[in-house]
């Protein structure tokens, strides 16, 4: 009986592994997408029809904002009945305190949903709406001081504007727009606004906008409609807009929601995104739980905390191809199969992914367990045995009629601290069938690896000593977090890994009484020949024979390059109960700045986009203005990246942890500037480097992180001690790096790369031409005109002088007596003299 059960179990496991493997081929017949397709392509735009803004209400008790809505271009039966009005202050106002009157005119009754940010409570606000319309307030405190009244507004822009002026004296803003689901209005007054509001067509202002979503044509197919443990969706975008010459990076939003309002939807998702243009994929998920992994060759970002209902990880893969056939083959070859859907859109900047609830997944386990194996974890699913085993065997086997072997996991501590969450009465306490959420531990799973973990309200920082790897025989390693794009930085002594609390695969759970435990894992991997799959557990691509049953090769014999090792770490945070004055950030009286220059004189900083040629010099000046003379700063990190997001690291590093990494870095010694204000001064640091053509793109970004340091021996605010770059290359430890991360400021400067040959001023070689090229000096226009005018005046004066000489010498020669009988030689001489004297002015000028 026992033998039959063991054979049945092995057959069951083998069938599960076989059915989970990649399909031998993928068939996908493209057709225009319809409403049933899971992915929809849209174009999001922000515009208004007409409008104006003014500062006419600055001396009056309230602001007046007028919204005149027009009917949208919709078919019969599709009239929109709800509008969300987003209100927040203009950029020059932090918290808005002034009373406001809103005139909300619409061609049909509407429900206005109000969403506000940075508007003070307790301030009078009046909403005048068309007949039949209502206003719903999202905040109860806001509604206490707000009133709503129905009015019969006049028709037409000018009539409505004149009505508002007659009623309130002046108007702050007037906006005409078609009915939209989302309208964004920024309240506040600015001196730069004109004195009166004069309505103009194509009114363009970031303060008054409406959002419109227009469906765009796309093609796609549903490859696999069967319920799967994970869904794989491939989206290919040809261009983010209709302008083929646009070089700016565009945000492409992926909006993930359930297709219908289910009680709860849990999914494992993989998104493979492809666009040849420079785009930034922004992933947002709502009302869906589970794991989401995003793969793209472009920049990947996630929405705000309220827009991330799933556990999100990302992987930037440069080897993702284009076209339908190659993308499907790439997904199959990399283990992302079966593919659920494929979608290609010529033009779009937004995609909606709607998920069906075709599979129930438990909250506690993101990785679902096949129903056939549920009996191994749930003893209640087994039939009651007539003669159950008793004694030690029953305790060891959990009531099963056969022994189940222990499955070791590489780098796990004994005692089962790193296990799946179990039912109250687990069958086999040591069983390890599938990866799951790990219990937080200070450090798990690596032998003799010394690390330290720090965390604050924004990020976690892990420092791992390099010597501990070398002592354990691990040379030449690559360290990442669960998200493989979050790679370790290095200095002379440590690997440094940084993770935001909501990124890089970091998870969290509540701990008593009011704390939060954040945990992640360090993935230790030898330099691979290709990119890994990047799943958080590192066990996605299990080959046949890796199931851990007897007969397999011992995991201790497997080379490190074939199986990554995980080191789990965690950090606990609790809210500060008694904040003291010493905990105030030292940056409250500090101002940072960074400028780029074209020469080492550092005279006039470059404005706008900085143009740099290949192998040309870039001169950088960073400065800090502070009141504390013992406060210093350092250039912690500088790198060049094709992405504007400073969190996206790049291999082109100029400075790392104060230490220069590029051999062309040269530092300069600027003078300290003292201000007339007592105890105020500005410290500057200057350096230059030679720009190398590493990236094949014309728009790059110089990212620099500045950090505060102290010149004192003891610092109450726990700032790191200021060190020189040469010293930082050898003596920087984990505690100093952690302290620097707490008070850093990031600057981003765009660089426009000029792709042409530029003569590099360097030392000449023997092969170079010893004859220097001729140098042509040019003059400006005014100088040339001055020289020409002076030459004209000189020529005129010279001509007049010659005429004067001619007129006087000609008269005297004509009055001379002629001898009556001169010799023949004298006659010819006299005739020749007379002929010469009676020449033209030009010939006289030539003779002279």
UniProtKB/Swiss-Prot annotation:
Pfam families, A to Z: Zona_pellucida, ZP-N
One annotated Gene Ontology cellular component of this protein: collagen-containing extracellular matrix
Recorded GO MF terms: coreceptor activity; glycosaminoglycan binding; heparin binding; transforming growth factor beta binding; transforming growth factor beta receptor activity; transforming growth factor beta receptor activity, type III; transforming growth factor beta receptor binding; type II transforming growth factor beta receptor binding
Keyword Secreted set for record: yes
Modification Phosphothreonine occurs at: 837
InterPro entries: ZP-C, ZP-C_dom, ZP-N, ZP_chr, ZP_dom, ZP_dom_CS
Record field: transmembrane: 785-806
Compositionally biased region (Basic and acidic residues): 411-425
Membrane topology label: Single-pass type I membrane protein
Disulfide bond annotation, renumbered to this chain: 52-197, 638-704, 659-729, 709-722
Subcellular location: Cell membrane; Secreted; Secreted, Extracellular space, Extracellular matrix
Region (Interaction with TGF-beta ligand), start-end ranges: 736-750
Signal peptide, first to last residue: 1-20
Low complexity compositional bias, start-end: 833-848
Stretches for region Disordered: 390-448, 813-848
Record's keyword terms, sorted: Cell membrane, Disulfide bond, Extracellular matrix, Glycoprotein, Membrane, Phosphoprotein, Proteoglycan, Receptor, Secreted, Signal, Transmembrane, Transmembrane helix
PTM per Swiss-Prot/TrEMBL: Extensively modified by glycosaminoglycan groups (GAG). Phosphorylated in the cytoplasmic domain by the type II receptor TGFBR2 at THR-837 to mediate recruitment of ARRB2 and subsequent internalization of TGFBR2 and TGFBR3.
PROSITE patterns (alphabetical): ZP_1, ZP_2
Extracellular side: 21-784
Cytoplasmic side: 807-848
Task performed by this protein: Cell surface receptor that regulates diverse cellular processes including cell proliferation, differentiation, migration, and apoptosis. Initiates BMP, inhibin, and TGF-beta signaling pathways by interacting with different ligands including TGFB1, BMP2, BMP5, BMP7 or GDF5. Alternatively, acts as a cell surface coreceptor for BMP ligands, serving to enhance ligand binding by differentially regulating BMPR1A/ALK3 and BMPR1B/ALK6 receptor trafficking. Promotes epithelial cell adhesion, focal adhesion formation and integrin signaling during epithelial cell spreading on fibronectin.
Subunit: Forms homodimers and homooligomers. Interacts with DYNLT4. Interacts with integrin ITGA5:ITGB1; this interaction promotes the internalization and trafficking of ITGA5:ITGB1 into endocytic vesicles. Interacts with TGFB1, BMP2, BMP5, BMP7 or GDF5 and inhibin A via the ligand binding domains. Interacts with ALK3/BMPR1A; this interaction results in the cell surface retention of BMPR1A. Interacts with ALK6/BMPR1B; this interaction enhances BMPR1B-mediated stimulation of the BMP signaling pathway.
Protein name per UniProt: Transforming growth factor beta receptor type 3
Species of origin: Sus scrofa
Gene name linked to the record: TGFBR3
């Amino acid at each position: 009986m026992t033998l039959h059960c063991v054979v049945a179990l092995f057959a069951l496991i083998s069938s599960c592994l076989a059915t989970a493997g990649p399909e031998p081929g993928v068939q996908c017949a493209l057709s225009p997408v319809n409403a049933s397709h899971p992915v929809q392509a849209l174009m999001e735009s922000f515009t208004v029809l007409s409008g104006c803004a003014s500062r006419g209400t600055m001396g009056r008790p309230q602001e007046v904002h007028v919204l005149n809505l027009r009917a949208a271009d919709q078919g019969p039966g599709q009239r929109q009945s709800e509008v969300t009005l987003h209100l927040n202050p203009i950029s020059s106002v932090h918290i808005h305190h002034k009373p406001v009157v809103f005139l909300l005119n619409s061609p049909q009754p509407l429900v206005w949903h109000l969403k506000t940010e940075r508007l003070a409570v307790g301030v009078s606000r009046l909403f005048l709406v068309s007949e039949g319309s209502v206003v719903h307030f999202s905040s109860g405190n806001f509604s206490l001081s707000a009133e709503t009244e129905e009015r019969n507004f006049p028709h037409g822009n000018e009539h409505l504007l004149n009505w508002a002026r007659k009623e309130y004296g002046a108007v702050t803003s007037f906006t005409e727009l078609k009915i939209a689901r989302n309208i964004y209005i920024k309240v506040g007054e600015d001196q730069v606004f004109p004195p009166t509001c004069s309505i103009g067509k194509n009114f363009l202002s970031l303060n008054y906008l409406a959002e419109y979503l227009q469906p765009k044509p796309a093609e796609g197919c549903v490859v696999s409609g069967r319920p799967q443990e994970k869904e794989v969706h491939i989206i290919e975008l040809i261009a983010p807009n209709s302008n083929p010459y646009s070089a700016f990076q565009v945000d492409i939003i992926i909006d993930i929601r359930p297709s219908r309002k289910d009680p709860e939807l849990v999914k494992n998702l993989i998104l493979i995104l492809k666009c040849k243009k420079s785009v930034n994929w922004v992933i947002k998920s709502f009302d869906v739980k589970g794991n989401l992994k995003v793969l793209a060759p472009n920049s990947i970002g996630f929405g705000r905390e309220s827009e991330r209902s799933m556990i999100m990880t990302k992987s930037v893969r440069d080897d993702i191809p284009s076209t339908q056939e190659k993308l499907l083959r790439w997904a199959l070859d990399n283990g992302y199969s079966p593919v659920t859907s494929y979608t290609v859109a010529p033009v779009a900047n937004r995609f909606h992914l709607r998920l069906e609830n075709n599979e129930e997944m438990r909250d506690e386990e993101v990785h679902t367990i096949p129903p056939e194996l549920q009996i191994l974890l749930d003893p209640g699913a087994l039939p009651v045995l007539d003669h159950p085993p008793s004694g030690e065997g029953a305790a060891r086997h959990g009531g099963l009629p056969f022994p189940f072997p222990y499955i070791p996991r590489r780098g796990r501590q004994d005692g089962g601290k790193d296990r799946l969450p179990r039912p109250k009465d687990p069958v086999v306490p040591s069983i390890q069938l599938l990866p799951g959420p790990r219990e937080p531990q200070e450090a798990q799973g690596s032998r003799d690896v010394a690390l330290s973990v720090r965390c604050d309200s924004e990020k976690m920082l892990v420092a791992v000593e390099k010597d501990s790897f070398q002592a354990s025989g691990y040379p030449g390693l690559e360290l990442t977090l669960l998200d493989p794009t979050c790679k370790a930085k290095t200095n002379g002594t440590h690997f440094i890994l940084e993770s935001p609390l909501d990124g890089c695969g970091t998870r969290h759970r509540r701990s008593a009484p009011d704390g939060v435990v954040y945990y992640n894992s360090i993935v230790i991997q030898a330099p691979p020949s290709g990119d890994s799959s990047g799943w958080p557990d590192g066990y996605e691509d299990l080959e046949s024979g890796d199931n851990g049953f007897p007969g397999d090769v011992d995991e201790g014999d497997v080379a490190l390059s074939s199986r990554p090792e995980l080191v789990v770490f965690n950090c606990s945070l609790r809210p500060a109960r008694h904040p003291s004055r010493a905990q105030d950030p030292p940056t409250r009286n500090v101002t940072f700045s960074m400028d780029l220059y074209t020469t080492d004189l550092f005279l006039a900083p470059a404005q706008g986009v900085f143009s740099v040629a290949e192998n040309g010099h870039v001169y950088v000046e960073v400065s800090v203005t502070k009141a504390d003379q013992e406060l210093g700063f350092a250039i912690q990190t500088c790198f060049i990246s094709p992405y504007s997001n400073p969190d996206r690291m790049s291999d082109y590093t100029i400075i790392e942890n104060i230490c220069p990494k590029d051999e062309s870095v040269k530092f300069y010694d600027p003078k300290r500037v003292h201000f007339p204000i007592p105890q105020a001064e500005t410290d500057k640091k200057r350096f230059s480097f030679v720009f190398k053509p590493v990236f094949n793109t014309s728009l790059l970004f110089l990212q620099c992180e500045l950090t505060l340091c102290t010149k004192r021996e003891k610092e109450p605010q726990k700032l790191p001690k200021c060190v020189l770059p040469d010293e930082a290359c050898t003596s920087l430890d984990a505690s100093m790096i952690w302290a620097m991360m707490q008070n850093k400021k990031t600057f981003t400067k765009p660089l426009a790369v000029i792709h042409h040959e530029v003569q590099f001023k360097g030392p000449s070689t023997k092969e170079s031409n010893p004859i220097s090229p001729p140098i042509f000096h040019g003059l400006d226009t005014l100088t040339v005109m001055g020289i020409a005018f002076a030459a004209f005046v000189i020529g005129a004066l010279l001509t007049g002088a010659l005429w004067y000489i001619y007129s006087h010498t000609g008269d005297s020669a004509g009055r001379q007596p002629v001898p009556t009988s001169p010799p023949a030689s004298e006659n010819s001489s006299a005739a020749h003299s007379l002929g010469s004297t009676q020449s033209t002015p030009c010939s006289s000028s030539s003779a002279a």
